[in-house]
Amino acid sequence: MRIIFSLFAFLLIATYANANNNKERFYIMPYEQQEAIKDLTNSIMQAKTKIDIAIYSFTNREIAKALREASNKGVKINIIYDSGQKKAENSTIGYLEKFDNIHTCLLEGKTARNGKYNGIMHQKMIIIDDNLIGLGSANWSKNAFENNYETLYFTYSTDTVKKASHYFKDMLKQCKPFI
């Protein structure tokens, strides 16, 4: 009986530890650049229904190709870019906008109290299937993943995903179409 109980306890602990390890993933670049980009692109490719992205600067072709492939599988994708990225060299906005299932738009930050300037949309966030969220300091550029000191964090936290989704929807309503 003791052996059965010990085996059961071991399996329970092993299952909990494994489930907990898959709930959160944290990368520090440039040290874990390969793992971070692989996790991000794999997460995109595993999406089933929808991907919501708010990203300040997005020039990384590998990530753009993963989004194109996801859209080809029928995944609906919304990407909010900072309004200043409309004319940015190498931005993926024009490339991704032309694909079915990908909607891109531009968002400007709030107007300063003095009315003289606007803030920026400086998020670096991806929400996949209202289930997984990725957050970090890194823009989606080759330089950010390979040379900069940046972070990328993934979690399945229901509360975090729900809160981020709420604010993403609000930002999306304020977004102006990319034309």
Model regions and ranges:
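Sec/Tat signal peptide C-region and signal peptidase I cleavage site
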Residues: 15-19
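Beta-strand acidic-aromatic groove motif in beta-rich domains, primarily in extracellular
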Residues: 64-66
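HKD-type phospholipase D/PLD-like phosphodiesterase module
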Residues: 20-46, 69-179
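Sec-dependent N-terminal signal peptides
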Residues: 4-13
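Acidic, metal-coordinating catalytic cores used for nucleic-acid/nucleotide bond scission
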Residues: 56-62, 84-87
